[in-house]
């Protein structure tokens, strides 16, 4: 029986929190926070990070090919796969963005 009482008390507390949240004033969503970065900035950073990963992988592969000491084949392969996966993920994001743009453009006005 005490579980039923605890459950009822929990439900009452949740409803009270819901009412408080609904009655609280909501901030204006049009103004962007000073420290917040835009989607374009975040996308640009992602593209730059993928480019850096590919460049590091290429440099590691070149160092292995010329026989530089301390470079292991497993490190080269892991770096190459990281670059490949990050590029594929970026390509998928691009495809989703293009598809979303096309869907929006095809909407009737």
UniProtKB/Swiss-Prot annotation:
Cellular localisation: Bacterial flagellum basal body
Pfam families: FliE
Gene Ontology biological process terms in this record: bacterial-type flagellum-dependent cell motility
Family to which the UniProt record says this protein belongs: Belongs to the FliE family.
GO terms under cellular component: bacterial-type flagellum basal body
Keyword Transport: no
Gene Ontology molecular function: cytoskeletal motor activity; structural molecule activity
Keyword annotations: Bacterial flagellum
Highest taxon, organism lineage: Bacteria
Protein name (record): Flagellar hook-basal body complex protein FliE
Hydrolase in keyword set: no
Broad class of where this protein is predominantly found: other
């Amino acid at each position: 029986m005490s579980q039923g009482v605890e459950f009822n008390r929990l439900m009452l507390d949740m409803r009270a929190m819901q009412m408080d949240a609904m009655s609280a004033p909501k901030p204006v969503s049009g103004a962007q926070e000073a420290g917040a970065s835009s989607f374009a900035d975040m996308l640009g950073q992602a593209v730059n990070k993928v480019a850096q990963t590919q460049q590091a992988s290429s440099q590691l592969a070149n160092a292995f090919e010329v026989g530089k000491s301390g470079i292991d084949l497993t490190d080269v392969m892991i770096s190459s796969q990281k670059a490949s996966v990050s590029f594929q993920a970026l390509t998928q994001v691009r495809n989703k963005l293009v598809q979303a743009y096309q869907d929006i453009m095809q909407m009737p006005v």
